[in-house]
Regions:
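Short acidic/histidine-rich motifs immediately flanking catalytic phosphotransfer sites
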Residues: 48-52
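ATP/NTP phosphate-donor binding region
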Residues: 1-45
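Accessory alpha-helical/coil subdomains and C-terminal extensions
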Residues: 3-11, 124-200
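Short Gly/Thr/Asp-enriched flexible loops that form oxyanion-binding sites at enzyme active sites
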Residues: 55-78
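Conserved active-site and cofactor/substrate-binding residues in soluble primary-metabolism enzymes
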Residues: 31-34, 38, 60, 64, ...
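Internal gly/pro-rich beta-alpha loop/helix module
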Residues: 82-154
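Hydrophobic helix-cap positions at the C-terminus of alpha-helices
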Residues: 11, 46, 72, 106-107
C-alpha cells in the first residue's frame, strides 16, 4: 500500500482513495480460503461507505477470486473491481499503472457490479480466464464480449454491453459470508480410461 500511495502521489493523482493491505501479502499461486476470508473482510468493511472497491491481485489466481466475488456479490451496493499486472509497478514497461488508474476510475464511475479490469478492457468477472503471462491482454472472457473499453485521454470508460449485464440480477445475501478453512478441494480431470477409483 505504501509503494502505491507514493506512486500515486508522484503522478499527482487527484482522486481521493483509501489504501489498505491484506493481512498477508503472498504469491497468488499460494491463495487459500483464509486469504479469501481476509479479502472479504476488507470488502465488507469498505463497500457500503465508499464509491467503489478495487482489489489488487496476483494474476495466477485472479480469475478465481473474481468469479468468487461475482457469486457472493451478485448485486453489490458499489462496484468491485479486480485488477493486477503482469509486470511490477517499478518496471519501465509495466502494465500496472494503466491497470491501476483505469480500475480506480471504474470503481468511481461504473454501475455497481463485479468486474475485472485489465489492459483497458472491462471484463465480466464470472467468465474471466487468464490466457497469458507475457502479454498485456492477459485475460479474456470466452463466453462474453468485453463490457467496455477505457479511454486514457478522457479518463473514462466507454460501455459496450453493460445494460444487458445489469438486468435481471438477483439480490445479494446480506449476511457476511466466510469460507470454511478446513475444507480441501481436489481438482480432478476426467479422461478416457480414468475411473472413479482414482479419487479414493
Amino acid at each position: 500500500a505504501d509503494s502505491i500511495a507514493q506512486y500515486l502521489k508522484l503522478q499527482n493523482w487527484h482522486h481521493q482513495i483509501t489504501l489498505e493491505s491484506a493481512a498477508q501479502l503472498i504469491d497468488s499461486s499460494a491463495l487459500s480460503f483464509s486469504h479469501w476470508n481476509n479479502y472479504l473482510d476488507l470488502i465488507y468493511a469498505h463497500l457500503e461507505s465508499n464509491t467503489g472497491v478495487v482489489l489488487l491481485h496476483g494474476t495466477d489466481t485472479l480469475a478465481y477470486t473474481a468469479a468468487m466475488l461475482s457469486l457472493l456479490f451478485s448485486n453489490p451496493p458499489a462496484p468491485i473491481i479486480v485488477t493486477g499486472s503482469n509486470w511490477p509497478l517499478a518496471d519501465s514497461h509495466s502494465d500496472a499503472p494503466t491497470n491501476l488508474f483505469s480500475a480506480i476510475i471504474a470503481a468511481q464511475t461504473l454501475p455497481a457490479a463485479v468486474y475485472v479490469v485489465f489492459n483497458g478492457r472491462l471484463l465480466l468477472a464470472s467468465d474471466c480466464v487468464k490466457v497469458s503471462s507475457q502479454h498485456p491482454d492477459a485475460f479474456m472472457t470466452p463466453h462474453c464480449i468485453d463490457l467496455g473499453r477505457y479511454n486514457a485521454r478522457s479518463e473514462c470508460w466507454n460501455y459496450i454491453k453493460l445494460p444487458n449485464l445489469l438486468s435481471n440480477r438477483q439480490e445479494t445475501v446480506s449476511e457476511k459470508f466466510r469460507f470454511n478453512t478446513s475444507v480441501r478441494v481436489l481438482n480432478f480431470f476426467l479422461v478416457p480410461g480414468g475411473g472413479d477409483d482414482l479419487a479414493d
